[in-house]
């Protein structure tokens, strides 16, 4: 699950679609974080806190293909047709054996959009963060080829960026996911370099937005690069699907 964690404040999701887009809203448990989702030709989201824009409309999507047929494309998040919307509130906790606390509270409001094409998109609004994930309802296995995850900001904010600096044998996706942080405006991010997560953006009023992943099963998979058009945001980059697997 992709997450945008905000320190000391809440978030709002807004998905700006196109003509005839369907719109849905979600609020955090304390009411300070509101989420608005527009689903149309594209699926985008926007986040705000207490009158402050945190994230401008940013596209999310997933591209794949049938496991046995390379010509059969599978796309989530394009030309979205929502069949129904489901909502629920959760107040629970989960154990954290390697953390300073024995358990952590898990309190959020959730919106799940069931979409035509065999998938759902799930949004969560926490008091201190927001997240989304795609859920496949395909009856056959498929291969994920790429994912769209944009994070667009309204200004050229200062950011703390953990660049990849250990390209083993020239392979930019082979990395230990450990790095020092460079501090610079978003517009000054290197266009030819990948960043790992978490990446922190310093917003107005002393607020901080942290982009990261959650719910990972094996290893971090999302890298980030500067948006070459706006220079005021970042885009996700993922290691390509391997054509051949060898034991290294």
Report each predicted region and the residues it spans:
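Bacterial Sec-dependent N-terminal signal peptides
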Residues: 1-23
């Amino acid at each position: 699950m992709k997450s945008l964690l905000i320190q000391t404040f809440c978030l709002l999701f807004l998905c700006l679609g196109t003509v005839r887009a369907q719109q849905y809203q979600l609020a955090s448990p304390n009411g300070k974080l509101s989420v608005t989702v527009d689903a149309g030709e594209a699926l985008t989201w926007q986040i705000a806190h207490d009158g402050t824009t945190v994230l401008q409309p940013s596209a999310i999507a997933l591209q794949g293909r049938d496991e046995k047929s390379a010509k059969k494309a599978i796309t989530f998040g394009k030309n979205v047709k929502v069949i129904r919307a489901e909502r629920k509130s959760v107040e629970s906790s989960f154990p954290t054996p390697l953390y300073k606390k024995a358990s952590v509270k898990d309190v959020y409001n959730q919106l799940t959009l069931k979409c035509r094409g065999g998938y759902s998109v799930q949004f969560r609004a926490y008091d201190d963060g927001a997240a989304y994930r795609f859920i496949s309802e395909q009856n056959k296995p498929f291969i994920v080829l790429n994912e769209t995850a944009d994070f667009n900001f309204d200004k050229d904010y200062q950011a703390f960026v953990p660049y990849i600096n250990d390209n083993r044998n020239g392979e930019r996706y082979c990395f230990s996911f450990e790095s020092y942080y460079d501090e610079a405006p978003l517009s000054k991010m290197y266009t030819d370099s990948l960043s790992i997560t978490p990446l922190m953006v310093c917003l107005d009023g002393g607020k901080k937005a942290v982009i990261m992943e959650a719910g990972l099963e094996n290893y971090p998979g999302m890298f980030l690069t500067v948006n070459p058009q706006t220079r005021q945001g970042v885009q996700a980059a993922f290691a390509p699907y391997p054509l051949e697997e060898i034991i290294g």
